[in-house]
Design a protein with these regions (language model features):
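Specific transmembrane alpha-helical segments of multi-pass solute transporters/efflux pumps
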Residues: 24, 28-29, 57-109, 145, ...
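Helix-helix packing/entry segments at the starts of transmembrane helices
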Residues: 45-47, 105-112, 175-197, 230-266
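Hydrophobic/small/kink-forming positions within alpha-helical transmembrane segments
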Residues: 26, 30, 57, 83, ...
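C-terminal-most transmembrane helix of multi-pass membrane proteins
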Residues: 2-4, 9, 48-49, 57, ...
Length: 306
């Protein structure tokens, strides 16, 4: 059994993986939006996740060969459910981006930081550490301030994005349940990506005429979203969630809004308002208290256990 110190190191490493996911997703937000100028949302989802599947599949094969314990028979079925939640979240987010701003989408997507602990209580009857609630509220406030402290008038795209946040929260919760039980984070990633690729391409073939010129024009965005945002980003999420709770993971993943703003300043010459910098500080503070307070308030008998 790992020592208390080893558990702390593992959890810190897990949260670093989740921060990396947030950074990669934040950088990919603009790509997701600009791709819609050339290609439909369904084909974009299908193609990006086809690339992500190609990234994850060799890792899943390596993982299978190295595994010491057999995988529960129900794991593939559970992974398929995660894939459906991921597809629903990706689809509603992309459809929302057709009619809402990147700012609104970034903030409303961040609602999952509140939805995750809510779903955990409703469906799993698990109460997260009390600090998760104020930390989630702080993270949401920080995202709001980062968006300039205001939202443009809500439209249909905004409501789709709120639905997206519910599906993201469901995906985070399901990953938190099943990645530990299966011990196969790479296979989980491969299966959920495959579900999104198949459903996206199938729906695209039915509802969106495929234009190879449009695909060529959107290729840089598709490649980034496929390899980095989907492939690397979601793999880091799944690996990180093996060693932390879903509500805590949601707080660290919400850093995508922070990284989107900071990378916009560094790479695109965008500006952050003074209120936005306060938002950055609030998000960072939320992550710190979510990491530190549960450890400081842990009963001594647990903290001292080997």
């Amino acid at each position: 059994m790992p020592s208390h110190q080893e558990r702390i190191v593992t959890r810190i490493q897990a949260n670093l993986f989740l921060l990396l996911s947030g950074a990669i997703w934040g950088a990919g937000f603009v790509a997701q939006s600009t791709a819609m100028d050339s290609i439909g949302p369904l084909w974009f989802i299908g193609l990006r996740f086809a690339i992500a599947t190609a990234v994850a599949a060799p890792l899943a094969l390596w993982e299978h060969r190295k595994a010491e314990q057999p995988m529960p028979k129900s794991s593939i079925r559970n992974f398929l459910w995660i894939g459906l939640a991921l597809f629903a979240g990706a689809m509603t987010q992309q459809l929302g981006l057709l009619t809402t701003s990147v700012t609104n989408s970034g903030f409303l997507t961040g609602l999952y930081v509140v939805f995750v602990p809510m779903l955990t209580v409703i469906f799993l009857r698990r109460k997260p550490h009390w600090i998760i609630w104020p930390a989630a509220g702080m993270a949401l406030l920080g995202i709001f301030l980062l968006s300039g402290g205001k939202l443009a008038g809500l439209n249909s795209g905004d409501f789709l994005t709120i639905v997206c946040a519910v599906f993201w929260a469901l995906q985070v919760m399901l990953v938190g349940i099943f990645v530990g039980r299966s011990g196969r984070p790479m296979l989980l990633s491969t299966v959920q990506f495959s579900v999104c690729a198949v459903l996206g391409c199938a729906a695209g073939a039915i509802f969106e005429p495929l234009d190879l010129t449009a695909v060529s024009n959107a290729l840089p965005e598709i490649l980034y979203a496929g390899f980095f945002s989907s492939g690397i980003g979601f793999i880091c999420q799944v690996v990180g969630q093996r060693y932390t709770t879903a509500p805590q993971a949601a707080i660290f993943l919400s850093s995508e809004a922070l990284f989107a703003a900071l990378l916009g300043v560094l790479l695109l010459g965008e500006t952050i308002t003074p209120v936005g910098y306060i938002g950055c500080a609030v998000i960072f503070a939320a992550m710190l208290i979510a990491e530190i307070v549960p450890e400081l308030t842990k009963p001594k008998s647990v903290a001292a256990g080997a």
